[in-house]
Design a protein with these regions (language model features):
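Hydrophobic "anchor" residues
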Residues: 39-40, 161
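Local cysteine-cluster metal-coordination motifs and their immediate loop/turn environment
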Residues: 51-52, 69-89
């Protein structure tokens, strides 16, 4: 049976999405291990960045010999706070490794392919257009030392940003989506004018993700932020 590698790589990206924005300086990676065209194990980068996805997927007593490993980013090959994932891949007898992105960390970038000279492991880089921007923020920070910034704007169909008849311009789906996005970011910047008008909380209110609150920065040049706002009651840190 011919293997559709993209199916397993897309599954790996879905796993990587789970902890996106919650792995600190490490990228959120997803890993899927396949044997005889069936998934036998999966893992993602843990909260705060460790253990890595490959370790979590391979940390089992089942046999991984001659299995295929699918991972969103090339496995690390350097010693840091944890041993390199490449060591565990060799130890477990993985036969083939498929990945989508080279890491930009100079300690490991494009070095995983060198293990093929030590062991007969087939290594192949696959491109999935749908996920070409998945690590955009990680690459921007590490390559250019720049912050990754998104802008959130609510606009009506007729291009207005205020509707006097309704509290929201957006629907419940888009509002929930915004809460999810907030959990993936480190900080939110808003203005005192906007917060005074909406009395917005600017946090994540999805069960299970509500503890991932981005830091809040308010631009208030004239010190007009009201004292009785909801944001003043939800967290001392913010």
């Amino acid at each position: 049976m011919k293997t559709n590698h993209n199916i397993f790589l897309k599954l790996a990206f879905n796993i990587a999405k789970i902890n996106l924005g919650k792995t600190k300086s490490n990228p959120s990676v997803g890993c899927v291990i396949v044997k005889n065209n069936s998934v036998i194990s999966m893992g993602g980068t843990s909260i705060n960045g460790r253990p890595h996805a490959e370790f979590n997927a391979l940390n089992s007593n089942i046999s991984f010999k001659n299995s295929d490993l699918y991972v969103t980013m090339e496995p690390c090959t350097h010693y840091g706070l944890t041993p390199p994932c490449s060591n565990m891949i060799l130890k477990k007898g993985i036969k083939k490794v498929f990945f989508c992105f080279n890491d930009v960390d100079p300690r490991t970038s494009k070095k995983f392919k060198n293990i093929n000279f030590k062991r007969n492991i087939e290594i192949k880089k696959e491109i999935i257009t749908k996920y070409k921007d998945f690590y955009q923020s990680y690459f921007l920070i590490h390559k250019k030392k720049e912050l990754y910034i998104d802008a959130k704007i609510a606009v009506s169909k007729d291009y207005f940003t205020i509707n006097k008849n309704f509290k929201w311009l957006t629907n419940s789906h888009s509002r929930r989506r915004v809460h999810l996005i907030r959990s993936e970011y480190d900080a939110i910047i808003s203005t005192s004018k906007s917060i005074n008008k909406d009395n917005s909380l600017l946090n994540c209110r999805i069960n299970g993700l509500d503890k991932y609150k981005p830091d809040l920065f308010v631009i208030d040049l004239n010190l007009k932020l009201k004292k009785n706002l909801s944001i003043n009651n939800i967290s001392k840190k913010r």
